[in-house]
Each structure stands twice: as structure tokens, then as C-alpha cells.
Amino acid sequence: MVNPSPTPTAPPLPVVETIVKATTFVWQERNEFLTLAFPAILVLSILNTVVALMLAGDSPQDLATDAERLEAAVQAGILPFLLLIVPFAYFWTTFAIAWHRKYLLPKDQPSIGEVLTWRSRHTRFLLQAIGLTIVAVVILLVGASLAAFAPVLLVLVLAAVVSVYGRLSQVLPSAAVDHGLSFAQSWALTRGQTARLFATIAATWFPTAVAVSLAQQILALILGDSGSFMALFVRAFVGNVLGYLAVAIGVSVLSLIYDHLRIGRTPSVDMQVF
């Protein structure tokens, strides 16, 4: 494996430019996005709809006893998670790796079959993503216990989560292109860039999350409370389209950061939009 070493002369990460170029890249490659994401969006939307219909029942508020309400809440929340976590993890991993490689290895032109074939890089990528999630959860739990005494600390906790994620996240694009960075190497690679990583990731995550949430709220108003197959499918389909667009933007940001840090220059993306 080829391990890119930290570049002492790497210039500071350009925050705004990185975000703009990531968004531009997704727009430029919108046809490729549809090709790569459509299988995941379609399959997950069907599964979401089927699971929702299978588990449809009375609202927890309409049930008589606390035990019934608890059982209904578990059924409505935990069971869908357990049923969908494996296909979600599979499609998220295969798409994220394909999108990382789309930017970092532009000459690589895999077929859909090759994109969906699980390889050792997928296992490494998924395990490191799980590791990042565990680190974030631990920081949140520890921070939340401290914030109980001083609520203002919650802001610092969230900042710490984003900062640590930024420092460690370079294992993901590295795994996607078989460079094999460890968490320690990612931490070393991002030395001196913490504030800019925080600004870049925070300015990507939060507006994207707000936009997706608003779009879903608008969709819910349009479709109402209908529990029909078509209404559930449309809701799931649009939600998955928005979700994978958010993934594509986030992955593009990490790829641009990795490209910038590993070669010590500003990543170059043709800014032509059309």
C-alpha cells in the first residue's frame, strides 16, 4: 500500500473554495451521480416502503397502556433500523467509495457491477467509518454529561466532535483508493489544519442537514399522512435522493481535502458548470 506522508509545505486548506468546488463537482458529474446512486436509491426506497407497511399499526399515543406504547415505539424505531441497517451500510459504502474514486481516480471507469462488488477496500472503509462513529459518540456522551452542569459546554462538545472527525476522516478517502492510512496517519496528515477542517466540514454538514430537513418537511406537507404504498414510496424515494446528494457533497469535500493535503497544493477542479 502507498501511504502518502504529511506535506509540511502544504498551504492552508481553502475553506470556501473547497466547499464551492465540491458542490460544483457534484453538479458537473450529475449524470454519473444518477448512474451510481440510482440502484441504491431505488432498492432502499422499496425496502423502506415495504418495512413501513409491514410495521404499520396504531400510533403510540392511541394505545392504552405504557407497555403498549413502549412496544409500539420500539417497533416503529428499532425494528426498521435492524431490518435496514445491512442494505443501508452496503449501498452507502459502495456509493461513497465509488464517489471518492470518481474524484481521486478520474481515469477509473468501473461498471455498475464493479461498483457494487464488495472488496477488501469496502470492508476497511466501513470499519473505519464505524470507528469514526464510535469516536464521535464517545465524545458526545462524555461531553453531554459535562454539559449537564454547564449547558454552554454543549457547543464546545459539538465543535470537538467536528474537529476530531475532520482530523481522523482522511482514512476514508485513503481507504477508497487503497492507500491505507491509519487513524494516526490521518491525524498527522491534518496537523496544522484543524480550524480550517472544522470550518469546512461544519459549513458543509449543517447547511446540508437544514436543506434536507426543510425539503422533507415540505414533502410531508404535500403528501399529508397518507399511508398508501405510493405515498410512502415517494416519501422514501425523495428522502433517499436528498440523502445521497448530501453524501456526494460530503464525500467530495473529503476527497478535495485529501487531494490538497497529500500533494500539498490546492485541488484543481474545472469550474465550468455546464
Question: Language-model segments: which ranges?
Answer:
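Juxtamembrane transition segments at transmembrane-helix termini in multipass membrane proteins
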Residues: 2-5, 58-77, 87-109, 167-179, ...
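Interfacial aromatic "cap" segments that immediately flank transmembrane helices
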Residues: 6, 10-46, 114-138, 163-212, ...
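Residue-level signature of transmembrane alpha-helical entry/exit and packing/kink sites
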Residues: 33, 37, 77-81, 85, ...
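N-terminal topogenic module of multi-pass integral membrane proteins
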Residues: 42-45, 49-53, 57-60, 74, ...
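C-terminal TM-helix exit segments that contain a strictly Trp-centered aromatic cap at the helix terminus
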Residues: 47-55, 140-144, 208-219
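Short, positively charged
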Residues: 73-74, 160-162
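Solvent-exposed, amphipathic alpha-helical "stalk/arm" or coiled-coil-like segments used as scaffolds
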Residues: 84, 88-97, 120, 124-128, ...
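Short hydrophobic membrane-inserting alpha-helices and related fusion/pore-forming segments
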Residues: 141-156
